[in-house]
Amino acid sequence: LTHSLTVSSIARSMGKKIGLYLEEKPEENFGRKQTEQLQALLQTVGLVHDLGNPPFGHYGEAVIGNWFSKWFLEDGSAYASSLTDQQIEEFKHYDGNVQNLRIVSKLQTMNDRYGANFTYGTMACLIKYPWNVLDSSASKGKYGYFESEADLIRNIYSKTGICDHVRHPATFIMEAADDITYIGDDIEDGAKKGYIPWEQAYRELRKKFSLTHSELFKSCDEYEQKIKSDLEPADKLAAKVRYFRNVVQGYLIQLAVDTFKKDYGNIMTGKRPAKQDLLSSDEAFVEALKGITHEYCFSCREVLALEVVGHHVISGLLDTFVPALVSTDADFSSPKSYVGKLYYLISSNFKYIAKQNYSEDDSSIKSIKKVEDFTLHDKLRLIVDFISGMTDSYAMGLYQELTGIKLHYH
């Protein structure tokens, strides 16, 4: 949540800078009202952009995808004929960004089929990669929507005027805000926890980029001279790293805004590739910043241990729920049966949504599915919706209960 709040704040500030720039261009017919709307749009998508992340974050995504890749080759091979190629690939390449759209459009249900009732523009801004998993553009498993949301995508394109394979312009801004936030915050967190040998890392970075980024390093060096000498070493380090984060984030924000301005024509006409982010014009520096955390933080004991735990928890939950619920003779009707017990453990809101069968032309419910009529895809999607919506602690607690490691008696 702290990360999302920061992304939301940075995205909003970038929206203001770009909006004020466009206000000065009469041909754009962009006024103060539009600037405020752009800010509100970016603030919203920044806040919800990570809702689809499963337990244990990006590593959790990989665990889900790897589990299904193995399952479809082994026990699940007998069921593969019941799914489309697209559905199979979606499970094998689970992506939290894609789940995000499903959450806000369906899973956060109220009284109709529209989920959180976001505008089409807001949902369009959440689609980082505007193509499906089978598209030739979906390299490295990067895609934007599930087959189950294909009708929604067509409506988004129709209502917003966005063409297939074209990003919403504000998506570039939101993505940059996300990158800027985690680049700065990861370095600060890593240095404070002692994983990053800050003095060494800073010297190496300054040596490599002192000519191209002289003002940035000059500002940091001058600030270091102003730090009170009576501060404890840990406090001095924290102050230096915090200032570095602020300076770097400020630089990257302006870099992204300037890139958006320079390439405004291509962005608005859909000619700028969706995979070309707003920080790519200073790729060497950005990659060097990311490299600091990759080198020192991603292999630290705390991270590795958490990932091992995440692997056991998520794999264990999938091992439990999938074989039981996909069985053709599964009895869902009673909590007295083993499968029934597992089914009743799934959150009621996910089961409610899985049962709805909406009319194609409006939001009315055409019929209610019986559990016995669930397709294989319905069952797998229900399980993934349930598990991916858990927090780390909830997933671990449920795993411990189901394996008998830790029981809660009432």
Across the structure, where does each feature detected by a protein language model lie?
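Substrate-recognition/cap regions that form aromatic- and gly/pro-loop-enriched pockets
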Residues: 261-361
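Zn2+-dependent metallopeptidase catalytic domains
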Residues: 113, 239, 333, 399-410
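C-terminal amphipathic alpha-helical interaction region
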Residues: 336-401, 405
